[in-house]
Amino acid sequence: MLHTQQLTTMLDLQQKMNAKVNPEWINAGYGFMRAAMVESVEAIEHHGWKWWKAQEKDLPQLQMECVDIWHFALSHILIEYQSDVEASAKVIAQQLSESETALTFDGNIYKFAQQDLLNNLELMTGLAAAKRFNVSLFMTIIAQCEMSTDTLFEQYVGKNILNFFRQDHGYSRDLGGKS
């Protein structure tokens, strides 16, 4: 499970990145959950779902998409708590400790452990489209992507450093791919 210090570090880094892009980011109305939804769909693509086409699951790319989703989810949570890093960390830690195992969405009950990765990614996509994020569902997906929370933390910090580099040197797709 992510520790409070890890959460605080990630939220602080995310807040600094967002402020670097736009000092008024908190009130800019950016579609962070829309971005998380797009990343979720990209994760589905990397999982492979087309029955008419031979596809293999690209686990490293799936993991990278999860890290991208986490960036946008942290931004969404920071906005909900008026950019208060400590309050945001506290609410995430509380959600992690509660370890929800299911949620109701659109009148249906979804039990995370009874769904495979692809179905959990679809559920996360639907939630993101509805501007909602469920930490427990995300952590289930992280586990299904064969990542530990420490790996999520390490990859998040690494990607954040890359994003700062991109901002400092003019964001370009030839600096290492997508955001």
Question: PLM ranges: what are they?
Answer:
Residues 1-179:
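Flexible "arm" and connector segments at domain edges
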